[in-house]
């Protein structure tokens, strides 16, 4: 490992959609043969040669491109309104993925707008409705059913991906998601953990601890739900060893997916004030690439990487500037793995290496 430390409707003219809402292989698939293809020394292998990506996983199971459409269903967050805390996480400005700042359009209209862009850009003609902004299980079950049903009523939507906090997934809501899974929709529960260290979670005002995440994963798995865990590299007070430990704790719970991205400083947050005062130093690009490549090597090949970096709108992003250059980051990850001669799962580490502070 690297030696790093750091302070519409379907596309026009598309053939008819078959098997609407069907996941053809809900059983666990074998991991892809990562890193096994021999490329010419002058060739540039795709990132999926090194990493088990969500896009490639869906392509293998559905036989065509499936793309997420982000949805803002006008939720709020219990860490903002007083139920769990006030002010939200120190790094959070949800305008970074809900930039309009106005009440969002209807779910159907958001999907229509998304499919027009995605279809033109990628050719995908089936979609997963990604409930993204704020806490997307923070409502009564009947309200959630109404919102999720609106998304699934679109003929080309094959499933749901629901982003939420680990302290906002009571049993009845997990049961609702399991109902959709039982109807053969693709269903992912995306849990925002960010760090497994309670000291860090308190420092960034998350409003929950690691125990809530642990319990949420166990309850989701009791119902056969797939879990994708969100993790941030570069949180205040953490170094490389914290990232390794958080990853291993997550993997020990048998999760199915991971989203990892760097901490970026956006306007309108307490982190932005700390950065301006010189109290927080963002990661350098080479540090992030080296660290996430270490994590990829430590991750078993069957785990699906839903995300390897994250961006924010240019008008909101303060630092680091490279967080606005998604493809530069992804290409850097690919090139680093190629240079190392490694790939996902090539350097598995046992959890007895954990630090416990």
Per-segment meaning from a language model:
Residues 67-71, 127-129, 160-162, 187-191, ...:
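Hydrophobic faces of well-ordered beta-strands that scaffold small-molecule active sites
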Residues 211-270, 286-309:
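Conserved C-terminal portion of the radical SAM core fold
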Residues 18-20, 27-128:
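N-terminal [4Fe-4S]-dependent radical SAM core
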Residues 141-149, 170-181:
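Distinct, well-ordered alpha-helical segments
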Residues 26-56, 60-67, 257, 265-357:
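Auxiliary Fe-S-binding modules of radical SAM enzymes
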């Amino acid at each position: 490992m690297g030696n790093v430390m750091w302070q519409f409707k379907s596309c026009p003219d598309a053939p008819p959609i078959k098997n609407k809402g069907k996941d053809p292989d809900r059983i666990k698939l074998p991991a892809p043969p990562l890193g096994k293809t021999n490329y010419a020394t002058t060739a540039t292998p795709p990132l999926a040669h090194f990493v088990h990506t969500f896009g490639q996983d869906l392509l293998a199971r559905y036989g065509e491109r499936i793309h997420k459409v982000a949805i803002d269903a006008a939720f709020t967050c219990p860490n903002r309104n007083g139920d769990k805390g006030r002010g939200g996480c120190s790094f959070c400005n949800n305008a970074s993925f809900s930039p309009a700042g106005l009440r969002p359009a209807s779910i159907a209209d958001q999907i229509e707008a998304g499919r027009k862009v995605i279809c033109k850009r990628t050719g995908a003609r089936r979609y997963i409705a990604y409930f993204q902004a704020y806490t997307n299980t923070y409502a009564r079950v009947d309200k959630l059913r109404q919102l999720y049903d609106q998304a699934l009523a679109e003929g080309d939507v094959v499933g749901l991906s629901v982003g939420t906090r680990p302290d906002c997934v009571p049993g009845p809501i997990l049961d609702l998601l399991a109902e959709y899974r039982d109807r053969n929709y693709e269903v992912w529960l995306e849990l925002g953990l960010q760090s497994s260290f309670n000291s860090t979670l308190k420092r960034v005002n998350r409003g929950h601890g690691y125990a809530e995440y642990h319990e949420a994963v166990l309850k989701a798995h009791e119902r056969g739900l797939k879990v994708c865990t969100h993790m941030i590299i570069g949180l205040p007070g953490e170094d490389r060893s914290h990232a390794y430990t958080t990853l291993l704790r997550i993997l020990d719970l048998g999760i199915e997916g991971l989203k990892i991205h760097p901490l970026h400083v956006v306007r309108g947050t307490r982190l932005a004030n700390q950065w301006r005062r010189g109290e927080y130093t963002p990661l350098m690009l080479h540090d992030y690439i080296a660290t996430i490549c270490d994590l990829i090597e430590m991750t078993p090949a069957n785990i699906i990487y839903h995300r390897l970096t994250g961006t924010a709108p240019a008008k909101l992003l303060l630092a680091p500037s490279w967080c606005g250059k998604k493809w530069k980051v992804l290409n850097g990850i690919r090139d680093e793995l190629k240079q190392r001669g490694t790939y996902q799962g090539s350097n598995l580490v046992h959890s007895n290496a954990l630090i416990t502070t």
